[in-house]
């Protein structure tokens, strides 16, 4: 996430949490653009994506991440008029550009609906406005697309940097917890990079 710095990476159990990555903004901000919010979603779904890359499935330990990511996506579409980020996709031989875009959005939506937390109910003006947003068909569709897009980005990020991520994990297994400047040095040394995602390739799509 741009403008944020990692402050703690831990696998010590705290309050039922089996792992924790903390990142704080370098400067206080009162608003964020869609790209900033999407980066936060990719971060939130990173652990789930890593489980998928390394183990081929996710555990029930991602419940908290799923809940917070769902709330964020719902807030983005319900209160901030946001939708999925722009993306480039190569049409198939019998497709128009619009049809190719719709095909990708449907795959985002399918993935996002599986990720989406739906353990509570509510209306738009009740104590649970997030559930109210998700009860609206159009908003629910957009929230699912955003979640799916963020998860695909997180999955490809981990897959592209798999060896570096594994080195970081091995270091953490030994040390259990890393803080501050030492953590920043470890992450900088890993040289993680964001890949260009080819949505026309099946390799880019996680198996859910």
Regions found by a protein language model. Give the residues of each.
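Soluble catalytic regions of large protease machineries
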Residues: 1-208
């Amino acid at each position: 996430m741009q403008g944020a710095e990692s402050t703690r990476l831990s696998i010590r159990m705290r309050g039922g949490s089996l792992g924790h990555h903390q990142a704080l903004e370098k400067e206080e901000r009162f608003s964020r653009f869609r790209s900033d919010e999407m980066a936060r979603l990719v971060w939130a779904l990173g652990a789930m994506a890593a489980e998928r890359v390394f183990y081929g499935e996710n555990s029930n330990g991602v419940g908290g991440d799923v809940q917070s990511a769902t709330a964020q996506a719902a807030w983005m579409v319900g209160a901030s008029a946001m939708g999925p980020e722009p993306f480039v996709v190569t049409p198939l031989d019998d497709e128009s550009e619009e049809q190719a875009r719709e095909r990708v959005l449907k795959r985002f939506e399918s993935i996002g609906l599986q990720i989406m937390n739906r353990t509570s109910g509510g209306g738009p003006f009740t104590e649970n406005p997030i559930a109210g947003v998700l009860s609206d068909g159009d908003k629910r569709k957009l929230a699912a697309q955003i979640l799916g897009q963020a998860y695909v980005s997180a999955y490809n990020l981990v897959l592209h940097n798999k060896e570096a991520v594994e080195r970081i994990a091995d270091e953490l297994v030994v040390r259990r917890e890393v803080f501050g400047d030492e953590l920043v040095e470890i992450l900088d040394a890993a040289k993680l990079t964001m890949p260009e995602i080819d949505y026309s390739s099946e390799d880019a799509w996680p198996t859910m």
